[in-house]
């Protein structure tokens, strides 16, 4: 039996949430700190499953680090160059794409013999486009089970050079190549085929590389130029900003049933594209205020929206459940990459929205949601996907309870999400 959590109807949400650190920023920063010259003090690191998988891998690769008792501060002694394994090594990375993709690239520098594997779902998440690009740069990589999917066996050999990578499936493939290229022997030019999805996530990568002393030139996100033979240098300390995708649930809750909710740790200077989620809520009718270190949202009369959300794929899921409380239909477009995330999020979202009474049209790369007059109480399947669990908590902002199956799946990015959500909520 799966555990479940029933949320009773909520009359009002109000208060402040200090956001946990960003998953995307935490795992990039940990890896760059490990590769850098010098010791880096990382503050506000996320403590979650995906981060633990990265830390376990770095430890197995001989990286020394010290974690604070609450695991949110990490002091990393950089190796000042590539990560190597003296003996053949197997690394288990769970379902952490932010660990699997960058490590698959970085560990192709040098000539170690390393296997990367993970949970069954990780073996269904495509990695072929990244492997193709790494092979163009000389990497020796074997698929151990299914072609184009993990587990992978890496035997080094990556030297840089002229690479092309498909940009349409995941921006993490490009992130992995960008973080690896400065340490390669040769200069690297990366050309993007097709439209690059989730561009703002590339901005996070470039921002972090710059913080660790490396500048990357690019031509409109289509061609990237990286000098080889460089070394990352520790910035000394680095503050991980709050997780903007995690902020989306609290901001949406305020838009639906505020009161006013303030999330801290992100703001108008944030490097994460998912902060643009607040602009979408504003377009729908919520009231939004931005500070340097906070975003605040208050209730408004919400209207349905029709919008391309390729730039905020994770936070866009929150719009799909917010749509239940808007007047008129909502269409979220250009989100094909929902299909290759923790689960096939398009099908999962459509299935569960129908359970609570919505009329849903699921396209190849879009979803259209027509809200019901009255929401239906339902048991929500979460598909081992943290974001499904968090998105559907918003159903309780109606006069109907909702039951979330396997609520602990939020441990991937936000272990105490439901406690934080309850803290803001006044029950009907």
From Swiss-Prot:
Reaction catalysed by this enzyme: 3-phosphoshikimate + phosphoenolpyruvate = 5-O-(1-carboxyvinyl)-3-phosphoshikimate + phosphate
Q: Which GO terms describe its cellular component?
A: cytoplasm
Task: Give the UniProt record's GO annotations in the biological process aspect.
Answer: amino acid biosynthetic process; aromatic amino acid family biosynthetic process; chorismate biosynthetic process
Residues annotated as binding phosphoenolpyruvate:
23, 97, 125, 172, 345, 387, 412
Q: What is this protein called?
A: 3-phosphoshikimate 1-carboxyvinyltransferase
Localization terms from the record: Cytoplasm
Q: Which SUPFAM superfamilies match?
A: EPT/RTPC-like
Q: Spell out the catalytic residues.
A: 314
Key words, A-Z:
Amino-acid biosynthesis, Aromatic amino acid biosynthesis, Cytoplasm, Transferase
Question: Which GO molecular function entries does the Swiss-Prot or TrEMBL record give?
Answer: 3-phosphoshikimate 1-carboxyvinyltransferase activity
**Chief place where the protein resides:** cytoplasm
Q: What does this protein do?
A: Catalyzes the transfer of the enolpyruvyl moiety of phosphoenolpyruvate (PEP) to the 5-hydroxyl of shikimate-3-phosphate (S3P) to produce enolpyruvyl shikimate-3-phosphate and inorganic phosphate.
Q: Name the Enzyme Commission number(s) assigned to this protein.
A: 2.5.1.19
Note the PROSITE patterns from the entry. Answer: EPSP_SYNTHASE_1 (PS00104), EPSP_SYNTHASE_2 (PS00885)
Q: Which family does it belong to?
A: Belongs to the EPSP synthase family.
Question: What species does this protein belong to?
Answer: Yersinia pestis
């Amino acid at each position: 039996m799966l555990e479940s959590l029933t949320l009773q109807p909520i009359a009002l949400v109000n208060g402040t949430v200090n956001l946990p650190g960003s998953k995307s920023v935490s795992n990039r920063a940990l890896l760059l700190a490990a590769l850098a010259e010098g010791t880096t003090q990382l503050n506000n690191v996320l403590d979650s499953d995906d981060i633990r998988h990265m830390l376990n891998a770095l430890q197995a690769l001989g990286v020394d680090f010290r974690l604070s008792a609450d695991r949110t501060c990490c002091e990393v002694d950089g190796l000042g160059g590539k990560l190597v394994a003296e003996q053949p090594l197997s690394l288990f990375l769970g379902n952490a794409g932010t660990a699997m993709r960058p490590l698959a690239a970085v560990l192709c520098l040098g000539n170690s013999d390393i296997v990367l594997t993970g949970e069954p779902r990780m073996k269904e998440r495509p990695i072929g486009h990244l492997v193709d690009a790494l092979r163009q740069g000389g990497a020796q990589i074997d698929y151990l089970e299914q072609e184009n999917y993990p587990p992978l066996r890496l035997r080094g050999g990556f030297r840089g050079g002229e690479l092309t990578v498909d940009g349409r499936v995941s921006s993490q493939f490009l992130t992995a190549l960008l973080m690896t290229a400065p340490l390669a022997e040769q200069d690297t030019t990366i050309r993007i085929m097709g439209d690059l999805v989730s561009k703002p996530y590339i901005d996070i990568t470039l921002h972090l590389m710059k913080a660790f002393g490396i500048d990357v030139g690019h031509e409109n996100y289509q061609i990237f130029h990286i000098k080889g033979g460089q070394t990352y240098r520790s910035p000394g300390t680095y503050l991980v900003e709050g997780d903007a995708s995690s902020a989306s649930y609290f901001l949406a809750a305020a838009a639906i049933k505020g009161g006013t909710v303030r999330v801290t740790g992100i703001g108008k200077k944030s490097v994460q594209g998912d902060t643009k989620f607040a602009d979408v809520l504003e377009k729908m009718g919520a009231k939004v205020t931005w500070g340097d270190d906070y975003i605040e949202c208050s209730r408004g009369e919400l209207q349905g929206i029709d919008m391309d959300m390729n730039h905020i794929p994770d936070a866009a899921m929150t719009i799909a459940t917010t749509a239940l409380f808007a007047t008129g239909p909502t269409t979220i477009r250009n989100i094909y990459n929902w299909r290759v995330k923790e689960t096939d999020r398009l099908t999962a979202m459509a299935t569960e929205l129908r359970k609570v009474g919505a009329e849903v049209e699921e396209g190849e790369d879009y979803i259209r949601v027509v809200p019901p007059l009255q929401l239906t109480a339902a048991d929500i399947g979460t598909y081992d996907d943290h974001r499904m669990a968090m998105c559907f908590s918003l159903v309780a902002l109606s006069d109907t309870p909702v039951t979330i199956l396997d609520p602990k799946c939020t441990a991937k990015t936000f272990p105490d999400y439901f406690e934080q959500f309850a803290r803001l909520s006044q029950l009907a």
